[in-house]
């Protein structure tokens, strides 16, 4: 598995470029609360961006979305008003001539692709649990994204990580999982040994859906973009015939990527959360 850790912003930008629906902007001089000036990438005599979406990719307007209402010389006018743009501000334009896709479409498609990949692949992880293990309680709450576990360890006073043995059935000495309750129980002498110590779980997790632009995705970015592009083109078949050929290409590319992401599980792996 390629752990590329691409941010939500990087995936959105890459997907928009993949769909040939993106113009990258960088302000060459100060603008205003409703204008963006780019002497390099904006040329009104060559292309009008009226009706496109402008998506700001740097502070102070990071993540803001506006609609282009005018293109004049090297200047784009947009609404609603935001913080004044300054030299070096960056943004992308999407929804090409009203026939492309909006930023919210790209976000939904990327998260849809992640959900599809989660049905096929999981991500190796080590999750440290807080607070420390309490033998009187006898259980650990499984982290929300963790799906499977194969090894439990506690850290002793010397800083060494020692394995908690696996129990073949509930009530036996060692650890067992209750997926329906999303807990791992440690019983008997192993529980006494781990009492009061930090515990960590080796296992496999699901990729969380992305929300903040800084959120990251550990799945192969090429596969996620291909799957998201497939979802977008499939949804737009009745809008533009050009997507008919693209949808087949992206479906094949995404399926190949998903097949590469399958992880060989440790033989001790147990499901810990349904």
Task: Give, region by region, the residue ranges found by the protein language model.
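Glycine-enriched, solvent-exposed interface loops adjoining structured elements
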Residues: 1-65, 69, 75-83, 90-274
């Amino acid at each position: 598995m390629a752990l590329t850790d691409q941010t939500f912003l990087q995936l959105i930008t890459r997907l928009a470029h993949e769909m040939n629906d993106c113009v990258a902007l960088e302000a060459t001089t100060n603008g205003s609360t409703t204008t963006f000036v780019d002497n390099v990438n904006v040329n009104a005599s060559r292309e009008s961006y009226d009706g496109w979406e402008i998506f700001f990719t740097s502070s102070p307007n990071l993540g803001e979305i506006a609609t282009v209402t005018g293109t004049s010389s090297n200047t784009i006018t947009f609404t609603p008003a935001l913080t004044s743009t300054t030299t070096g501000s960056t943004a992308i334009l999407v929804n090409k001539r009203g026939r492309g896709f909006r930023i919210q479409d790209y976000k939904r498609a990327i998260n849809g692709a992640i959900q599809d990949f989660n049905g096929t692949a999981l991500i190796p992880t080590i999750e440290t649990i807080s607070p420390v293990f309490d033998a009187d309680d006898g259980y650990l709450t499984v982290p929300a994204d963790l799906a499977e576990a194969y090894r439990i360890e506690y850290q002793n006073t010397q800083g060494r990580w020692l394995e908690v043995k696996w129990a073949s059935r509930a009530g036996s000495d060692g650890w067992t999982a209750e997926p329906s309750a999303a807990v791992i129980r440690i019983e008997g002498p192993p529980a006494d040994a781990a009492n009061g110590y930090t515990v960590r779980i080796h296992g496999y997790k699901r990729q969380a859906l992305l929300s903040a632009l800084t959120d990251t995705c550990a799945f192969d970015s090429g596969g996620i973009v291909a799957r998201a592009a497939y979802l977008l083109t499939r949804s737009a078949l009745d809008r533009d015939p050009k997507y008919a050929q693209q949808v087949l290409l992206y479906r094949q590319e995404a399926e190949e990527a998903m097949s590469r992401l399958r992880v060989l599980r440790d033989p001790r792996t147990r499901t810990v959360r349904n």
